[in-house]
Amino acid sequence: MFNLYSLIMHDFTLLSTGAVLCTVGLLVLLFFFREKILRYKCLRFWESNAEDHQNIEAFLKNYGSYAPKRYNYSEVKRMTSCFKNKLGQGGYGSVYKGTLQNGSHVAVKVLNGLKGNGEEFINEVASISRTSHVNVVSLEGFCFEGCKRALIYKFMPNGSLEKFIYEERSDSVRQLGWPILYKVALGIARGLEYLHRGCTTRILHFDIKPHNILLDEDFCPKISDFGLAKLCMKKESIVSMLGARGTIGYIAPEIVCRNLGGVSHKSDVYSYGMMVLEMVGGRKNVDVGVDRTSEIYFPHWLYQRIELDEELQLIGIMNEEEKECARKMVMVSLWCIQTDPSNRPSMSKVVEMLEGKLDSLQMPPKPYLYSPSRSEVDSLEVGSYQCSRSNV
């Protein structure tokens, strides 16, 4: 009995020792792999920073005296009074109001050092540096100092178009009257026409939306935020793209569903059309919170009104001239949001239609309901394409 007990205890001790040794060994392996992963990430971080630095230096060398001014981080802190006056914040970082030495006001976009690998930053600097147009925001300078990055723009007193579209007022009066809305829509169209045709290198924006349209003191619109832009030669009708670019609600169908057509400058046309419809309605194009289900998809509801030659019932229309202006903006936008890219007009044609007479516009085909979900965009980014299109 005693020998049996001793044998059992001996085996138990061996098992316990073995379990402890296995646990220690496993912990050592986990620690080893953790250190290796951290070392790899650290190495990639510094390699990425070094690559970004080389790209910036190459950019400055190529542009010479035409490159925007480069500021160091201490100058950025000084012009923003140590980041005292914050204008806004987003996933990219924060925007602060600043003042240059000559007294001019600027908006300083300080990028989040943890977001992205610097590609969007370099992309924006390179894109805007190629532009010079009244309807495109001007880059006053930039800061690139290690992981500290900032973009310095001319200050726009009226902020983004977004706040003038969706913010409700108790008296149900539009914040922007129809003459200004038309002026803004036409200005954005001219800015996009310039990006597509007026630059030596064609610039496709890929993120046209109210938030990215800034307004100066006279409500002159400026296209901003070129972080997702793509540069291509004018002779290129179709561009290659590895992942989805843009914002849900404004993304052209072909960007998510490649079988619908090639990605091109017509993708910006679609985003423009969706944005102008929101300007017209003072609401999101897809809104499940409306009273009547027929109004959930705003473009379809507007199409029905025009097809039946009924009043658009839009807020703030005071006379026949404004009624014609609103109807024209809707008609042009419905052409812009056609699912087939080949059916959409170029931005040059959009400008022509907006400047022309309403009775010269033909009735566009009925629009399809197309609104990609976040899961569809995510699936595109990992290489699979899904599509959702329905006639409503």
Segments predicted by a language model, with ranges:
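Extracellular/luminal ectodomains of secreted and membrane glycoproteins with large N-terminal domains
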Residues: 1-6
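Conserved eukaryotic protein kinase-like
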Residues: 7, 11-392
